[in-house]
Amino acid sequence: MSSEVVPLQKKGRKKAGAGVVVDGEKDGSRPYMCPICHRGFHRLEHQTRHIRTHTGERPHACDFPGCAKRFSRSDELTRHRRIHDSDKPKGKRGRKKKSETIAREKELELQRQRQQQQLQQQQQQQLQQQQHQVLPAEIKISAPMASSMMEVTQAINQRYQDTHNLSLSYNSGSNSNASSGSNSNSSLNQVFSITSQPARDLAAKPMFQLGSDESEETSNTTTLHSVHSQQQNNGSVELLLNAARFESEKSTTLLNNNTPSFKFIDRPPLTSSLSSPALSLVSQSPVAGAGPGFGPANGNGNGAANNNGLLLPRPTSRPKLSALSTLKRMTPLSQVSEPQQPAASLPHLQQVSSNGFLDTNGHAASVARNKSWTNLGVMPSPSESGSSALVSRFSSSASLNKLMDPSSRTSSAVSIATLMNEDKLQSQDDLSVVDEFGRSRKKSKTSTPIRRPSSNMGFGTGPASHAMEFCNELQSRLKSVDQYSDRSAGDEKDYYFQSRSSSSVCTPINSPPSERLVSSTSNNKTIKLPSLRSLDILPREQH
């Protein structure tokens, strides 16, 4: 018995993507073929989705705000949207965590923004704090300079206070020696002590120096320019105070003595250095019976204020001549008015009365100087006048040594009051008398008085007793310096700074006559007013 085994034939199966016929069976139709891999698809959507895998196109995008995912299939997009729509989406692990991280990221972004704002605010605050801290640092750097400035300021204030106290004590000492008008002068002296600093510095300097070095000439001239600009603002105050002093002293002088005299106004040294006080001469009372052109007041009472002259330091080309000539033209000077001696005690007045130069009261009439303080060609020559022409000279050698000693110049200036006190020690033989013109002169062998033309005549009285003492010493002392008289007065520079009419302040005895009277009687056509420094000691010779 033999049997044959016939194997079973397997049915042919269709492989995906291939229209292969197996065992004569034809697979279903796949009309949609992939152009890239030649794969066939039953539907067009499947072919399109397959082609997107080759091209990488993802047309389906998530429209949730903040989500930028895109998908190639629509079903993937719908599944993705579930994540955004549901709070707890189902699906794979990590989706829940991923959604939480997205929310946290948003919160973190908000926190970062807040932190940035806070940082900006902190930076601004730090910048402001740094700016405030820079200012104290700069102040600390400049603190030493400020301390040094404070020390300098305190030193200046202390020095000013010391000088102010010295000035007050000086004024109180000078007021104790004054006459009955010291009560009114004490208040004015206090006002003098509180004037401005430039005026005090200028007042502390002497009006004239005796025999200084040649090197001081340049410094004096530069000081003149620097001080003059400051003196212009403060000069009016000084003039008003001098006018007030003049008015207060005038009333007391008229009660005590009817004759005009001069008073020294010793301005206190307001600086710490030992500089001598300046001397200014102010007429105490106007001349009785003078016209409108006479007297320092000139009818308005402001003459003394407007006629305040200022003597500046002088070079030393001719120290003896300049000093003694200045003292000569300032005679007679007295610090305290004294009653005049009677006419009977002066034998020379009897001789003067015989010539007709005495008034009804027995006093000698004085001759006022010209405004120009110079002889207008009518003065007698030295040979004609003799020793009586020099009416103002010193006789005390100690006084002249003080004037010419450099050490005494540097320490303190020689005041005229000191010289007059030393004159009182002279013997009675050296006393001089008053001539018919009211001017003192030394006794000489020739008894012929000096007479000037009527053009220079003036009317008034003078203190004869003080004139004798002062002028006697000056007359004897000028003999030692006559060898310098040959030099011309024009060679010297004018160092005398005058105001508009300073001659009425510094003129002894009386004020000068008016220019109208002088021009009508004098032979000169024009009258110039040279300074006091430019005058010679001896009168010029007549030609």
Curated annotation (Swiss-Prot):
Xref: SUPFAM superfamilies: beta-beta-alpha zinc fingers
One of the GO biological process terms: carbon catabolite repression of transcription from RNA polymerase II promoter by glucose
Ranges of biased composition (kind: Polar residues): 224-233, 446-458, 498-525
PROSITE patterns in alphabetical order: ZINC_FINGER_C2H2_1 (PS00028), ZINC_FINGER_C2H2_2 (PS50157)
Record carries keyword Transmembrane: no
Residues in C2H2-type zinc fingers: 32-54, 60-84
Entry's family note: Belongs to the creA/MIG C2H2-type zinc-finger protein family.
Major place of residence: nucleus
Keyword Aminoacyl-tRNA synthetase: no
Keywords, comma-separated and alphabetical: Carbohydrate metabolism, DNA-binding, Metal-binding, Nucleus, Repeat, Repressor, Transcription, Transcription regulation, Zinc, Zinc-finger
Residue ranges with Low complexity bias: 303-313
A GO CC annotation given for this chain: nucleus
Compositionally skewed regions (Gly residues) per UniProt: 292-302
Region (Disordered): 1-28, 73-102, 167-187, 212-233, 292-318, 437-464, 482-525
Function as written in the Swiss-Prot or TrEMBL entry: Involved in glucose repression of glucose metabolism genes.
Any GO MF annotation of the entry: RNA polymerase II cis-regulatory region sequence-specific DNA binding
Protein name listed in UniProt: Regulatory protein MIG1
Biased composition (Basic and acidic residues): 73-89, 484-495
Subcellular location: Nucleus
